[in-house]
């Protein structure tokens, strides 16, 4: 499944805010090496550079389209194609930063444990993941998946991502290697122009696996079914806008 940097950046300000909030809690004054894991189009990498300078900062992603966008955005920064499921730093890093990527990897608890080994003493693993499977935006994806002529494809194979573990599970897994762990949730409330705007948002991320699995022949029909459900789930406010509620989990682990 190929990602679209162009679709992703349609709501760049809203998508970048959690990365900014995560970086604000990183307790480092300086660093020699930082890697932006799942860097996407480079918006989060740019934040790291703004705070710490460009030297020693790099990004990696598995998607060629995202990497191309990141290289255009930050031509002086190294961006590498890599699989986060198996990647490990070749030398100790001071910061491993991951904004909205590990929710796609079911075994991310194991990966976090391994990444802690790739940090220098006092180094930081900083992670943010959407925790929104229980929101109407994502419940409607499952409803649409099993409602149309495409439903046989979803009965054979689910594309719903795995729910996140409870905060206690992340703490328990990391505390053996961490001197300090901060874990918190933030719920963002985004005023959107209308229900179609919510659809445009999730077309860049959570809805993509559903559209790909339904197949190109059913793409527009699936989107129409999904939009109808979103219109019912998100009533208009006094100014005609709708409110997208978006919970996210954050964790910052400092290595012993």
UniProtKB/Swiss-Prot annotation:
Catalysed reactions listed for this entry: trans-aconitate + S-adenosyl-L-methionine = (E)-3-(methoxycarbonyl)pent-2-enedioate + S-adenosyl-L-homocysteine
Family matches, as InterPro entries: Methyltransf_25, SAM-dependent_MTases_sf, Trans-aconitate_MeTrfase, Trans_acon_MeTrfase_C
The UniProt record lists the keyword Phosphoprotein: no
Entry keywords, A to Z: Cytoplasm, Methyltransferase, S-adenosyl-L-methionine, Transferase
Enzyme Commission number(s) of this protein: 2.1.1.144
Compartment annotation: Cytoplasm
Family annotation (Gene3D superfamilies): S-adenosyl-L-methionine-dependent methyltransferases, Vaccinia Virus protein VP39
Top-level enzyme category: transferase
GO biological processes: methylation
GO MF term set: trans-aconitate 2-methyltransferase activity
Family: Belongs to the methyltransferase superfamily. Tam family.
Functional summary from the UniProt entry: Catalyzes the S-adenosylmethionine monomethyl esterification of trans-aconitate.
Name of the protein this chain belongs to: Trans-aconitate 2-methyltransferase
């Amino acid at each position: 499944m190929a990602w679209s940097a162009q679709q992703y950046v349609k709501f760049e300000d809203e998508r970048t805010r959690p990365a900014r909030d995560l970086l604000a809690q990183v307790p480092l004054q300086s660093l020699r090496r930082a890697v932006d894991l799942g860097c996407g189009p480079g918006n989060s990498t740019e934040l790291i550079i703004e705070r710490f300078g460009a030297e020693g900062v790099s990004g990696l992603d598995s998607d060629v389209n995202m990497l191309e966008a990141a290289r255009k955005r930050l031509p002086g920064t190294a961006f590498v194609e890599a699989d986060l499921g198996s990647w490990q730093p070749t030398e100790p890093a001071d910061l491993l930063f991951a904004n909205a990527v590990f929710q796609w990897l079911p075994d991310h608890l194991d990966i976090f444990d391994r990444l802690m080994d790739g940090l220098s003493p006092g180094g930081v693993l900083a992670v943010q993941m959407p925790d929104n499977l229980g929101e109407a935006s994502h419940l409607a994806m499952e409803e649409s998946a099993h409602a149309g002529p495409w439903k046989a494809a979803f009965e054979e194979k689910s594309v719903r991502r795995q729910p996140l573990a409870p905060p206690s599970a992340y703490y328990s897994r990391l505390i053996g290697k961490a001197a300090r762990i901060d874990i918190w949730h933030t719920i963002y409330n985004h005023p959107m122009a209308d229900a179609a705007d919510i659809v445009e948002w999730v077309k860049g991320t959570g809805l993509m696996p559903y559209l790909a699995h339904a197949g190109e022949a059913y793409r527009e029909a699936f989107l129409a079914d999904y939009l109808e459900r979103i219109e019912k789930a998100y009533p208009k406010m006094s100014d005609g806008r709708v409110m997208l509620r978006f919970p996210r989990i954050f964790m910052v682990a400092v290595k012993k």
